[in-house]
Swiss-Prot record:
<dbReference type="GO" id="GO:0005694">
    <property type="term" value="C:chromosome"/>
</dbReference>
<feature type="compositionally biased region" description="Basic and acidic residues">
    <location>
        <begin position="561"/>
        <end position="582"/>
    </location>
</feature>
<keyword id="KW-0158">Chromosome</keyword>
<feature type="compositionally biased region" description="Polar residues">
    <location>
        <begin position="151"/>
        <end position="181"/>
    </location>
</feature>
<dbReference type="GO" id="GO:0048188">
    <property type="term" value="C:Set1C/COMPASS complex"/>
</dbReference>
<dbReference type="GO" id="GO:0032259">
    <property type="term" value="P:methylation"/>
</dbReference>
<dbReference type="InterPro" id="IPR024657">
    <property type="entry name" value="COMPASS_Set1_N-SET"/>
</dbReference>
<dbReference type="InterPro" id="IPR017111">
    <property type="entry name" value="Set1_fungi"/>
</dbReference>
<feature type="compositionally biased region" description="Basic and acidic residues">
    <location>
        <begin position="221"/>
        <end position="243"/>
    </location>
</feature>
<keyword id="KW-0539">Nucleus</keyword>
<dbReference type="InterPro" id="IPR012677">
    <property type="entry name" value="Nucleotide-bd_a/b_plait_sf"/>
</dbReference>
<feature type="compositionally biased region" description="Basic and acidic residues">
    <location>
        <begin position="675"/>
        <end position="688"/>
    </location>
</feature>
<dbReference type="Pfam" id="PF11767">
    <property type="entry name" value="SET_assoc"/>
</dbReference>
<feature type="region of interest" description="Disordered">
    <location>
        <begin position="404"/>
        <end position="443"/>
    </location>
</feature>
<feature type="region of interest" description="Disordered">
    <location>
        <begin position="211"/>
        <end position="243"/>
    </location>
</feature>
<feature type="compositionally biased region" description="Basic and acidic residues">
    <location>
        <begin position="907"/>
        <end position="922"/>
    </location>
</feature>
<feature type="compositionally biased region" description="Basic and acidic residues">
    <location>
        <begin position="749"/>
        <end position="765"/>
    </location>
</feature>
Length: 1263
């Protein structure tokens, strides 16, 4: 592009001294020139002007005559630029060998001078006098900034003088004044012929090259030029080459600036500089289009940030819907970063626009300049215009369809205003009823056509007489246009064909077949009288009438054709109406959202709702509950109970039994996983299902450990589902709050806890309770190594007698059936099975009262599988002979295991039991025998089994069999795969030695078993039991830490029986252990090493100051102890020491994610919802919590103990608080690490967490 001419210095500064001096000089020159013109002969130009053609013939000389046509179209003088030079190349075609000649050649040529004078006179002078206003671009009408050509004035003056001197006036003359304009520039040279310069005609230096005889004193000769009028123009030296003009044009590679250019060339613009440039400058903002509006805008900005630093970016959105439109504007700014080269915003925008093929995901975007945002604004307006046109087109189509529909009745003059409910209102009929039209109130007529709903004639029921349909009356569900789509969505699970509407209601039509009738009946049964928004959907089922032979097919075909004829247009109208309603809903929602977007109003609504909830809770807990409690107090209704002969509620108190598993008193620890109301009343239920309260009725049959398989099945007794309300209002603490209030109070109590050094975890949650509740275990199967697992209530002798009596009747039936089945007298076999080791325990061991009070509930693994009621068997199965023998022996040995040394009250019951068993056994002996069933010769026993023997190799060795009974080894080898064991005798000897070592009696006959380890399945088969955890009672037989805990528990139980206070002794032992310092003897080398280590520590103490905790933390790498985590006897996982740890040694740091208090509460709720039962949250202060649930170390596995061996300290290191675990006393190898969680004591709280540490000083609860 060409650079436009700039303003001159004189225009900007007209009062400058230099400008004034130049103006004065020009005025003097003009004055001198005028004086010269008046002194000479007046110049007249004789010419002939043709009136028809407007041609002026000028006669300037006898030899020079030029005729020209002067017209407005031909006379267009060019405006010279300020930068023009008089020596530039000027095209010329008069008397020149080249079409391009220099300015000097045109000035010094006579013919050129005459031609130029004639041409100028013919093209300038007549136009200035004849048509001065017809040329806007002429020098006279040009602005002051235009500068006329000096050569033009020079040639015109010379032509004027010659014409006035040589041409007399003849014929009709036209005198044209030759006055110069007032702003005419003074010529730089004298217009008259004068010496222009000197030309060297002889140069002796050049002549001496060819002629050596030239004298050295010879001087060059010069000749003046310029005075001749007819001097030929000088030749162009560039054309003096041998190859001429073509060689010059084509060989300019070594002179690129002298290239011949036949067309103007764009000059490179100057770079923009805000300091010297005027105007907005090049654009720095671009607009990006054609990308997917659904992708994140960060991807677009990330791609265009590679061109430069982005100052601002805007993803254009729809002003009404808020949806993105798919184009954005990005503005760049100058980037001056020390690590990168500087990039200006102009260059960044230019690079972004010039880049090709930029992809955003799978779309190639388009980038254009948008300096002031006009392009993006125009695109937004076009988009809105297209949407408006589209909406208007749809509206016109709707109106056209409405105009084509037949009128259904008179319409009122004023149409009701279509108002929409607020966005928060439901999109149902209730929301439509809230919109009250403004204007003249109208009475709704059922006969008129509802907007968007095509009503059919009133005889629709007659048309559908042969089809199954359901009729919904208009009284129950009003006929509104918004009801129909919601009704279709509600009934979409039923196979209806269509829903037709008339002024009386809705007709839900089904297919005329057996399937359609079935679907209609199913829909009627499921949906009739159900809630549909705020309406009661009342239905009437109308099945097709019985078919008649005459005309039934004709009626059915006519009804079907009528229905299908109207189905298609109704479907289209319904689809269009639904789409228009959705668009109207969207527009109204936008308006309401923009109108109601006020955070203050929303905050007021939130506060109002919370205050309403608190008020209702306060009324329910503080007003209603005490009033109901006082009203339902049994003492206030004593007279009425006596009148109606009703028992006192205290007489209905149930007695806990062993079989029920409820062996703890009301004073004991409540079950944390039981129902909240049952926890408050202190009553333990045998099962804890999630949020389902189990009720008991007086006289309910208790399940025993054994179920009589031969007893008659009694009909089930109808039980009341709920007890009367006074059962729950016995104690004042149970009527204070409901379940929801209990949960709310627990949350509030948790929020108001003070900051303490404890992890907010290890709590029993509802999720854990619900998980454990689905496991078929009873309360007696508590999996815990604490004293609670072995604590049993004191049992009465009367209860034992009842149990024995029930067992005797069972044994009688079993023995009788066995005798009939096997033909064996069981009396003769009683002696063989006395003193069996692996007999099944039936009654658990009794426990002391102290153990009952210290019992803690823990529902993980059952402690005993016999103490619970048996499951309902899937079917009766016959017992084996072995099982039949084991049960009576178990009944015999059980009273012996129950009997305690000091229990004298059970002696009479034992004697009675023995007598009853003896009499029962005698009664079972048959009086007469059938001699045919017995052999006549004495029998020789082939196999004599020792006591408690099982099939094994020693049994086969002592077996005396005949040759017929010996198995065929060759046949067995072909049938089964064999294995080579080498020497059979050596293998047998090795196996017998191993069996002797593993057996209890060191014999081959005794079984290799662990006493009490084998527990039979209650259902008789392991497959029917499902998956169970291993009981802690079984783990205590082989796991070291369980064995240690069990031994300590047994020692405490023994001390309690002797009357010693275990808690006091434990406190004394802890105090002695804390004060005791173990002196360890070391060798000489060890002592020297310790001295060096102590000296090193002292030096570091001096450097760090007196803060010993900080010093210990800095030595964590040197003093960290090796620990491991494994299954704990206290709870889930635990941390164990892998070496002996001395007192006050640092063990490990509690590492986790540091979060704020508010974030920790949100995370705790999230963990509970996601099923994470335990959350490892450790509070540092009021505002900081360490969360080690998902990011943390193994220190989170340290359990709580009331007699801990560690402590947690919070120390400050380099401005941040850290949690470090220290040893309180000497810790042995493989000892579990524990510390006190230090929960706040909540005496009287209904949501207390039981403690499971099992120590002598256990407080029972964590809180």
């Amino acid at each position: 592009m060409t650079r436009p001419p700039g303003a001159s210095f004189a225009e900007f500064f007209p009062t400058a001294p230099k400008v004034k001096a130049q103006a004065q000089t020009r005025a003097d020159q003009v004055r001198d020139r005028d004086r010269f013109k008046t002194a000479s002969t007046p110049a007249t130009i004789n010419g002939t002007i043709d009136s028809t053609t407007g041609t002026a013939v000028l006669e300037a000389d006898a030899n020079v005559s030029l005729n020209g046509i002067v017209s407005a179209s031909d006379t267009m003088p060019t405006q010279p630029d300020d930068t023009e030079s008089p020596f530039t190349d000027i095209p010329n075609t008069v008397d020149s060998a080249s079409s391009y000649s220099s300015a000097a050649s045109s000035i010094f040529s006579t013919s050129t001078r005459h031609g130029a004078a004639a041409t100028t006179a013919s093209s300038r002078l007549p136009t200035s006098s004849l048509t001065p206003s017809a040329f806007k671009e002429s020098p006279n009408s040009a602005p002051a900034a235009a500068k006329p050509d000096m050569s033009t004035y020079q040639t015109s003056d010379r032509a004027a003088r010659q014409s006035s001197r040589n041409s007399p006036a003849t014929g009709p003359n036209v005198s044209i004044s030759n006055g110069l304009p007032s702003n005419e520039r003074i010529p730089a040279r004298d217009p008259l012929p004068s010496v222009k310069g000197l030309r060297c005609t002889y140069d002796p230096l050049l002549d001496r090259v060819h002629n050596k005889s030239v004298s050295k004193s010879a001087k060059p000769t010069y000749e003046e030029f310029g005075r001749e009028d007819d001097a030929p123009p000088p030749k162009d030296p560039r054309l003096a080459r041998s190859d001429g003009r073509l060689g010059y044009i084509n060989t300019d590679y070594y002179l690129p600036k002298s290239r011949l250019r036949t067309a103007p060339e764009n000059i490179k613009p100057y770079p923009y500089d805000p300091k010297t440039s005027i105007g907005p400058g090049p654009p720095t903002q671009i607009v990006v289009t054609r990308y997917n509006p659904l992708i994140p805008f960060s991807k677009v900005t990330a791609i265009f940030a590679s061109f430069g630093e982005i100052a601002e970016s805007s993803n254009k959105m729809h002003p009404e819907t808020g949806s993105y439109l798919g184009f954005a504007t990005i503005r760049y700014r100058d980037s001056k970063r020390p690590d990168r080269p500087p990039v200006s915003g102009i260059d960044a925008a230019r690079r972004a626009v010039r880049a090709r093929g930029i992809k955003v995901d799978a779309d190639i975007v388009r980038v254009e300049y948008d300096a002031e945002g006009r392009r993006s604004r125009r695109m937004l307006e076009e988009h809105l215009k297209r949407e408006k046109e589209k909406f208007e087109k749809i509206e016109q189509e709707r109106l056209a369809l409405a105009a084509k529909a037949p009128p259904t009745g008179p319409k009122s003059g004023t149409a009701p205003a279509f108002t929409r409910p607020p966005p928060t209102a439901p999109k149902g009929p209730s929301a439509q009823r809230q919109s009250i039209p403004t204007g003249t109130p109208q009475i709704p007529l059922l006969g008129t056509q509802v907007q968007g709903l095509n009503l059919e004639p009133s005889n629709l029921a007659q048309k559908l007489a042969d089809d199954p349909y359901i009729y919904v009356t208009g009284d129950s569900v009003p006929v509104l246009p918004s009801i129909l789509p919601h009704m279709k969505k509600r009934l979409k699970s039923y196979g209806f064909e269509e829903i037709r509407v008339d002024k009386s209601g809705y007709f839900i039509v089904f297919r005329n077949s057996f399937t359609g009738s079935s679907e209609a009946e199913r829909c009627f049964r499921a949906v009739n009288h159900t809630e549909f928004f705020n309406y009661d959907m009342t239905m009437q089922l109308c099945l097709p009438r019985p078919r008649r032979e005459d005309g039934s097919g004709r009626r059915r075909s006519s009804a079907s054709s009528d229905r299908h004829t109207h189905a298609e247009p109704r479907y289209r109208d319904e689809k269009d109406r639904r789409r228009r309603e959705e668009e109207a809903d969207l527009e109204e929602e936008k308006k309401q959202r923009a109108k109601n977007f006020d955070p203050v109003i929303e905050a007021v609504e939130v506060v109002r709702r919370e205050m309403m909830e608190h008020l209702i809770r306060h009324i329910r807990t503080k007003v209603a509950a005490p009033a109901l409690s006082d009203f339902l107090d049994p003492a206030n209704h004593a007279a009425k109970r006596r009148k109606l002969n009703i028992e006192h509620p205290d007489d209905l108190q149930e007695i806990p039994s062993i079989e029920d598993g409820n062996d703890s008193s009301r004073v004991g620890t409540p079950n944390s996983r039981a129902d909240p109301i049952e926890r408050r009343t202190g009553r333990l239920e045998p099962k804890a299902l999630p949020r389902i309260r189990k009720t008991k009725v007086k006289g309910q049959a208790q399940k025993s450990a054994f179920v009589d398989p031969f007893a008659r099945k009694r009909p089930p007794v109808a039980r009341n589902a709920f007890r009367s309300l006074h059962h729950r209002l016995r104690s004042l603490d149970s009527d204070a709050e409901s379940d929801d209030d209990t949960d709310t109070r627990a949350l509030l109590a948790r929020e108001t806890e003070e900051a303490d050094s404890r992890p907010r975890s290890r709590m029993s949650t509802d999720d854990e309770a619900s998980k454990d509740d689905f496991v078929p275990w009873e309360q007696g199967e508590d999996d815990s190594m604490t004293e609670a697992s072995f604590a049993i209530a004191d049992t009465a002798s009367t209860r034992k007698r009842k149990l024995v009596a029930s067992l005797e009747s069972v044994f009688k039936r079993q023995k009788k059936s066995d005798e009939e089945l096997f033909g064996v007298n069981l009396e003769t076999l009683d002696s063989e099975f006395k003193g069996r080791e692996d007999s099944v325990d039936i009654i658990p061991e009794p426990e002391t009262g102290d153990d009952v009070e210290s019992r803690v509930s823990r529902s993980e693994t059952p402690a005993s599988a016999i103490g619970k009621p048996l499951k309902k068997r899937p079917g009766k199965r016959k017992k084996t002979k072995k099982a039949s023998f084991e049960e009576p022996e178990a009944a015999k040995t059980q009273p012996e295991t129950e009997q305690q040394p000091g229990d004298e009250a059970t002696e009479p019951s034992k004697v009675k039991q023995e007598k009853a068993e003896k009499t029962s056994m005698e009664e079972l002996v048959p009086e007469k025998f059938d001699e045919k069933l017995f052999a006549t010769e004495p029998l020789t026993p082939a196999l004599e089994l020792p006591e408690g023997a099982k099939p094994d190799l020693p049994i086969f060795q002592g077996l005396t069999v005949s040759a017929q009974d010996i198995p065929d080894l060759a046949k067995l080898a072909r049938r089964f795969n064999t294995k080579d064991i080498g020497n059979a005798e050596l293998w047998l000897w090795t196996r017998n030695r191993i069996r002797e070592l593993n057996s209890a009696r060191r014999t081959l006959d005794s079984p290799v078993t662990i006493g009490g380890y084998y527990v039979p399945n209650p259902t008789g088969c392991a497959r029917t039991e499902g998956v169970k955890k291993i009981l802690n009672s079984e783990k205590s037989k082989y796991l070291p830490h369980h064995i240690k805990v069990q031994k300590a528990r047994q020692e405490r139980e023994a001390r309690n029986k002797l009357g010693r206070d275990a808690a006091a002794e434990a406190a004394d032992a802890a105090r002695i252990a804390a004060e005791k310092l173990v002196a360890k003897g070391n060798s000489r080398a060890n002592r020297a090493t310790n001295r060096r280590y102590v000296a090193d520590l002292n030096d570091q103490k001096k450097t760090l100051g007196q803060d010993s905790d900080v010093f210990k933390f800095n030595q964590l790498k040197k003093r960290k102890k090796p620990v491991k985590f494994a299954r704990s006897a206290i709870h889930n996982w635990g941390l164990y020491a892998m070496e002996n740890i001395a007192k006050d040694d640092m063990i490990i740091e509690y590492v986790g994610e540091q979060v704020r208090q508010q974030i920790s509460e949100i995370r705790e709720n999230r963990y509970l919802k996601s099923g994470i039962g335990s959350s490892y949250l450790f509070r540092i202060d009021d505002n900081t919590v360490i969360d080690a649930t998902k990011k943390g170390g193994i220190a989170r596995f340290i359990n709580h103990s009331c007699m801990p061996n560690c402590t947690a300290k919070i120390i400050k290191v380099e401005g941040s608080k850290r949690i470090v675990i220290y040893a309180l006393r000497d810790i042995a190898l493989n000892e579990e690490l524990t510390y006190d969680y230090k929960f706040e004591r909540e005496i009287g709280s209904t949501d207390r967490i039981p403690c499971l540490c099992g120590t002598a000083a256990c407080k029972g609860f964590l809180n």
